[in-house]
UniProtKB/Swiss-Prot annotation:
GO biological process entries: mismatch repair
Protein name: DNA mismatch repair protein MutS
Naturally occurring in which organism (per UniProt): Idiomarina loihiensis (strain ATCC BAA-735 / DSM 15497 / L2-TR)
GO terms for MF: ATP binding; ATP-dependent DNA damage sensor activity; damaged DNA binding; mismatched DNA binding
UniProt record similarity statement: Belongs to the DNA mismatch repair MutS family.
Pfam families membership: MutS_I (PF01624), MutS_II (PF05188), MutS_III (PF05192), MutS_IV (PF05190), MutS_V (PF00488)
CDD domains: ABC_MutS1
Function in brief: This protein is involved in the repair of mismatches in DNA. It is possible that it carries out the mismatch recognition step. This protein has a weak ATPase activity.
Binding site for ATP: 620-627
Keyword Transferase: no
Amino acid sequence: MPEFSDKQIQSHTPMMQQYLRIKAEHADMLLFYRMGDFYELFFEDAKRSAQLLDISLTARGQSNGEPIPMAGVPYHAVENYLARLVNMGESVAICEQIGDPATSKGPVERKVVRIVTPGTVTDESLLAEKRQNLLVAICPLNPKQPEAEYAISSLELSSGRFWLTKAHSSEQLAAEMQRLEPAELLYPESISLAGLPLAKAKCKRRPAWEFEQQTAFMLLTRQFGTQHLEGFGIKNNEPTLAAAGAILHYVKETQRAALPHIQALITEHPQDAIILDAATRRNLELQQSMGEGDTHLSAVLDKTVSAMGSRQFQRWLQRPIRNHQELNQRYDAVDALKENLNFENIQLTLKQLADIERIVARVGLRSARPKDFARLRDSLAKIPEVRASLSHRSLSYLHDIIEPFPEVVDLLTKAVIEQPPLLIRDGGVIAEGYDKELDELRDLATGATDYLKQLEQRERERSGIATLKVGYNRVHGYFIEVSRQSSEAVPDDYQRRQTLKNTERYIIPELKEHEDKVLNAQARSLAREKWLYDQLFEHLLPQVTALQKSASGLAQLDTLCCFARLADNYRYCRPQLQKETSLIELEAARHPVIEQLSDEPFIANPMSLTPQQRMLMITGPNMGGKSTYMRQAALIVILAHMGCYVPADKAIIGDIDRIFTRIGASDDLASGRSTFMVEMTETANILHNATAKSLVLMDEIGRGTSTYDGLSLAWSCADYLSRQLQCLTLFATHYFELTELAEELPATVNVHVDAKEHGDTIAFLHKVSPGAASQSFGLQVAKLAGVPEHVIHKAKQKLSELEHTHHGGLNEPKQATMELTPPPEAIPSHTEKRNPLLDELEQLDINDLTPKQALDILYQWQQKQKGSTQS
């Protein structure tokens, strides 16, 4: 939108002058400007909204001799349009008429009453019920070294949860962004966001002064009503406060209301949870599938029945904790909920509850709607039923958190009708009998039916018109209606109010006097009802903290019931946690997602990673199950640190601080990085940041480059992980030379995934056994994948040659053989004499070679060339 000087603004109509001044204060967002029954948009806002919302673009008046573009949406449907805009990442300022048109001279007074942004929405229609909607702020702790350390703060305005943490590197910052998935991100104008996974976030540059520590301290202490922040475990001079202060400033600016539901700031220390970097979260498919469909862990294992419970499940999944005392408390609760299928009855009740957490937040913001009050009342009425199921001592802490609120239930039962309308402006929300004055006004406004019937009968007799009727509509008010034929017989005091095709409508002084009384009573009745509605907020605000606490308890209970259901339905076992050492010992472990989605019975496998056996070198064919075996170990560790039972017959898990994965291969085209560059970047991150307490998953390291380079890198990485870092490592490879490391490296053991050959086919047993694989089955897998028969045949011929002429070198198991019929096509002959190696090179299909086959061919050619040179 073009900027206007004061002189240019003066050249517009008074209404447009008002619009331009308000728009200048909200230049970076769409302005919904209330005009009667519509919210209108002008200039560039109109063009943009017409494109985004597919609404008509018209014009109104002129500016600098050009028509002013205009678009609009009806006020009664505004929430639907807001939802669409927010989902597109747009921010909208809502400008309402606050003056009385009847008494206004010039334009009706207007002002922006709220600002809707992707990270600050609280309306039910604008939120995904099972996902957190986070506003996040970041800032460097040292402006001179902007990539050293970062303060990170996040706020879920729809619940009041407010967190503060720190990232010690740009890699940790990227991991936090992957974990939090912010709907909106605030950052100081002094830094760049390049390289962060923020595709879904609306990023907003903010002035540097909003990130000043002293400003933050003042805002936070004022919000919490304290003189310092030590009660929250935060030092008054804590540098990370800057990010929290920026969030609070932004929310106050957008909401333009008190924030009583934001009661505390929680500090999260990275060392208190298992750290999962961005690549690990992606590779393990915790909350997003890498393929099609909802096959990620969250989609498959989330058996909660309430929106609150589902969001709690996500929070525990995003941040698996290391506090064994708290984890064992959750295990105990799951065990108690499993008894007599107690979770079944509890979840039947929880399923009937509304989203108390978000309703309470709207109460705090004074934006709750009549239906919110009704659903809060009905949900709180069921809490005693829930608490009655929590008598077991392992559930007593939840019993104490989840309080009953009989006074609130009683208040809302008396005050709000059973099924109230959507908005208070429609009236009819406050129940009859709650307020004597309101009842009297309603009687005056609606209790005159008998009077109108009597008036109608009198006027029929007075006029002699038997079909005369007394009626009412919202446009013309009360009227007396007669047919066109009878209009000549009306008395002289009848004043025509409206002419229709076949009827005439009139008003008389007596009816006009009644209309004034009724309309006045209706206006007073609605005003009284709105006042009473506001008083409900005053009654409920002191209960907000306790209500939030109970809502949190209900969310935890639902998630624990989900864990109990998983344990009961799928034979999960209780993990045994050990603090003394880092280890993972599993008996009959399964992959929690594949087990549920596969039509075939899942083959369980053991795993042992201990101080005496820290690295497993895993070999076997593609599709054999190596990646599944590795991933299920990581997922079991994560589930155990959520407080969930795990898919195994027995699980002993030691102290794990981080999980790393180097799995899969793909280009990062957006950043201009090749497959190999992505692979090496992730590998470097592991080698720099893994500790002796870390679990590392390495799959096919080195395959993105030449055979010698790849083998050398894989060998060296395995050596470093084993000798230097001494972390728990699962190392899958097709370089069979690496199996020799079991004899060279300490605490390294070979295991393999079994497969059996049946004629021309291969059966994958998915069973993990000790020792290195005996065959690689590369040609059989290629055939299963649909590689053309003549290509398989050529590969078979070349493999046979290589196996007969192999001289020394590193040891590799032979390829399994297949009896294949030669294709009918003849190989063209060359009459001219030339180096036979060139013939072999022309016939070679490099796309169908494994790295090891390529290495062997190169070796063989080298030997042939040396022999021919010597002769």
